[in-house]
UniProtKB/Swiss-Prot annotation:
Keywords from the named record: Cytoplasm, GTP-binding, Hydrolase, Magnesium, Metal-binding, Nucleotide-binding
Main subcellular location: cytoplasm
Organism: Trichormus variabilis (strain ATCC 29413 / PCC 7937)
Subunit structure: Monomer.
Name this polypeptide is given: GTPase Obg
GO CC terms: cytoplasm
Positions with a binding annotation for GTP: 166-173, 191-195, 213-216, 280-283, 311-313
Length: 342
C-alpha cells in the first residue's frame, strides 16, 4: 500500500432547503392562512478518526467532498428534510488545517474522535413564518443559506511511542524487522526506506508498543533537504527517540552530531525528547582497530543518554536496550499522569 501523509481537499456542507409559499386549502375554509414550511438544514461535513486507516491515499484520488442539501419546505407547515451529514474517515494522527488561512482546525489522535469541519446551511423560512397582524397572507419566503466551504490541508503524523532515527543506512529497517513483525524493504544502500514503517514490539507483559522506522535523515533535513520536513514531522508525537548510529562509520561522533543538529534546527522540542543511543552493526566492526567501548563513552558524554552496543542482524544487545526503552516509557507515562492530577 502506498504511504501518503499529506493531502489537500475541498469540503462543502449542504445548502439549506428553501422555504416555500403555500396556503391552507381545506374544505369549508376558502381563505386559509399561510402554511408554507421552512427548508431543512443542510448536511454538515464531519471528520472521524479510525484505526484501520494508515495513510491519506484515498484523498489523492478524490479531492472534493460535499454533504447533501436540505429539502424544500412543504405545505401544511411541514419542514423540509435535513440533509445527511457527510462523514469523512481519516487515520488516527491526522492534523487538519485551513489551507487558505493556515489555521489549525483540529487534531484527531484518538479512535472515533470527531470534528465538525463545515456546518450545513440553515433552512430558509416558509411564508407561515411571516404571518402577522398586518400581513395575513404573506406571499414570500426565503431561500436556504449556503453551507460552509473550506479548502483543507491534511497532514498525517504517525502515532508511535518510539521513533527510530539516524542517517541513511544506519540499519533502522533491519532493527524494526528484528524487533517486530514489520517487514520493510532492506538493502545495502542509503535511502532504501522512503516511507515511515511501523512495527509493534511486545513487552514481556504482552502489551504492544509502536515503533516507527523514520526514513534516513540527512544534513539540512530541518530545512527540507531530502524530504526532511516530511520525515521529521512523524517524530513529533513520539515519546522516546532511539538514535541509531552505524558503528562501521569512519566518524561516529560526526554522524551523531549531524542528526542532533537537525533535531535542534527543526525545533518543536525534538532535541529535548527522551533519547537512547545505539551503536549498530557491531558484528561488522574489527574490534582490534575500533574501541567500541571508548566510542560509547564519548557518545554518552555528548548525549547524556544511555548508549548501547547492538547488532540488529545478530540481535546482540537488543534485550538490554529494550529494557531501557520500557523503563523510559514508564517514566514518561508516570510524569504525564502526574500532570493530569496536578
Amino acid at each position: 500500500m502506498q504511504f501518503i501523509d499529506q493531502a489537500q481537499i475541498e469540503v462543502e456542507a449542504g445548502k439549506g432547503g428553501d422555504g416555500i409559499v403555500a396556503f391552507r386549502r381545506e374544505k369549508y375554509v376558502p381563505a386559509g392562512g399561510p402554511s408554507g414550511g421552512n427548508g431543512g438544514r443542510g448536511g454538515s461535513v464531519v471528520f472521524v478518526a479510525v484505526e484501520n486507516l494508515q495513510t491519506l491515499l484515498d484523498f489523492r484520488y478524490k479531492h472534493i467532498f460535499k454533504a447533501d442539501d436540505g429539502g424544500r419546505g412543504g405545505p401544511n407547515n411541514c419542514t423540509g428534510a435535513s440533509g445527511k451529514d457527510l462523514i469523512v474517515q481519516v487515520p488516527c494522527g491526522t492534523t487538519i488545517y485551513d489551507a487558505e488561512t493556515g489555521d489549525l482546525l483540529g487534531d484527531l489522535t484518538q479512535p472515533n474522535q470527531q470534528l465538525l469541519i463545515a456546518a450545513g446551511g440553515k433552512g430558509g423560512l416558509g411564508n407561515q413564518y411571516f404571518l402577522s397582524n398586518r400581513n395575513r397572507a404573506p406571499e414570500y419566503s426565503l431561500p436556504g443559506l449556503p453551507g460552509e466551504r473550506k479548502l483543507l490541508r491534511l497532514e498525517l503524523k504517525l502515532l508511535a511511542e518510539v521513533g527510530i532515527i539516524g542517517l541513511p543506512n544506519a540499519g533502522k529497517s533491519t532493527l524494526i524487522s528484528s524487533l517486530s513483525a514489520a517487514r520493510p524493504k532492506i538493502a545495502d544502500y542509503p535511502f532504501t526506506t522512503l516511507i515511515p514503517n511501523l512495527g509493534v514490539v511486545r513487552k514481556p507483559t504482552g502489551d504492544g508498543t509502536v515503533f516507527a522506522d523514520i526514513p534516513g535523515l540527512i544534513e539540512g533535513a530541518a530545512d527540507g533537504a531530502g524530504l526532511g520536513h516530511d520525515f521529521l514531522r512523524h517524530i513529533e508525537r513520539t515519546r522516546v527517540l532511539l538514535h541509531l548510529i552505524d558503528a562501521t562509520s569512519d566518524d561516529v561522533i560526526r554522524d551523531y552530531n549531524t542528526i542532533e543538529q537537525e533535531l535542534q534546527a527543526y525545533g518543536r522540542g525534538l532535541s529535548e525528547r527522551m533519547q537512547i543511543v545505539a551503536l549498530n552493526k557491531i558484528d561488522a566492526v574489527d574490534r582490534e582497530t575500533v574501541d567500541l567501548d571508548a566510542l560509547a563513552t564519548q557518545l554518552n558524554h555528548l548525549s547524556h543518554a544511555p548508549v548501547f552496543l547492538i547488532s540488529a542482524v545478530t540481535r546482540t544487545g537488543l534485550e538490554p536496550m529494550l529494557q531501557e526503552v520500557w523503563g523510559i516509557l514508564d517514566q514518561v507515562n508516570a510524569l504525564e499522569e502526574a500532570e493530569v492530577f496536578r
